[in-house]
A protein has these predicted regions:
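Short, conserved "active-site rim" segments that organize catalytic pockets and cofactor/ligand binding
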Residues: 2-21, 87
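Glycine-rich phosphate- or other oxyanion-binding loops that anchor nucleotides, phosphorylated ligands
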Residues: 3, 27-245
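Short linear motifs in intrinsically disordered
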Residues: 21-27
Length: 245
């Protein structure tokens, strides 16, 4: 079976999959990375955001020499038809900064995923849907796709909806540090002092648990089937400023 690398932002996004996997710490480019290994599959949890995802993707490529790179994790819905726990296998990943696109060769759907540089609120979700015609938004996939294209490695992206198109997330961007780590304790204190946020925070936590279960169940089956799946074709990239799927 080929070596497959999965890149996620946070361990909790894939906790159901990696609960009993081997945990390894390795250094790359002066930084410490945690990898979760089982057989020919390795998971790198590099942190939230484009920079963190780029670093994690480069590290896992150089250290493990995978034959496929897979971006997984949470995403926000841009269309009302998508609900918490729904999965989206992207056929194209769009970088909102410049409109560049990475196409997943062999994808049998028309699901566009756009990567945005910050946490997207309801209005920003509407703007992204209008500008790019995408179905969902995340904060990492475009960076992972760019690394895959640069190294000539096949790429895929599977995301699970953790917040629906009309769900206004609490203020979260300020609690993401430069390394892409979420400062949970700081956020908890911030929310605890603001009773008007409690309902949203409780719902967010429940949504995150549901999303984690759905993604982990999907990935468990995917990992089991890897040995029976033919080698994928490398992703291709292009630059298009206009929107559309």
């Amino acid at each position: 079976m080929r070596k497959v690398a999965i890149v996620a932002a946070l361990e909790r996004e894939v906790s159901g999959l990696t609960r009993n996997w081997n945990r390894v710490e390795r250094q790359y480019d002066g930084r410490r990375f945690v990898f979760l290994e089982r057989g020919e599959v390795v998971v790198a949890c590099g942190g939230i955001g484009l920079d963190a995802a780029r670093r994690a993707a480069e590290a896992v490529i150089v250290l493990y020499h995978p034959t496929q790179l897979h971006s997984v994790g949470f995403a926000g819905a841009l269309i009302p038809e998508l609900h918490v726990g729904d999965l989206i296998a992207a056929s194209v990943v769009i970088d909102a900064r410049d409109g560049s696109r990475a196409f997943v060769a062999g994808a049998d759907n028309q699901s566009s995923l756009v990567t945005y540089m910050s946490v997207a609120g309801v209005q920003q979700k509407k703007n992204l849907a209008h500008a790019f015609g995408a179905k969902a938004v995340d904060m990492e996939a475009a960076a992972v796709a760019a690394a895959a294209v640069a190294h000539g490695i096949p790429f895929a992206a599977t995301k699970v909806i953790s917040d629906e198109s009309n769900f206004e997330l609490p203020e979260m961007a300020r609690f993401i540090d430069p390394q892409g780590r979420f400062k949970t304790a700081n956020f908890a204190l911030f929310a605890a002092l603001r009773p008007w946020l409690w309902r949203r925070v409780v719902l967010l936590a429940a949504n995150s648990r549901k999303a984690t279960r759905a993604l982990s169940e999907h990935l468990e089956l995917w990992v089991q089937d890897l040995s029976r799946v033919s080698e994928p074709v490398a992703a291709t990239s292009g630059s298009h400023a206009e929107g559309g799927k």
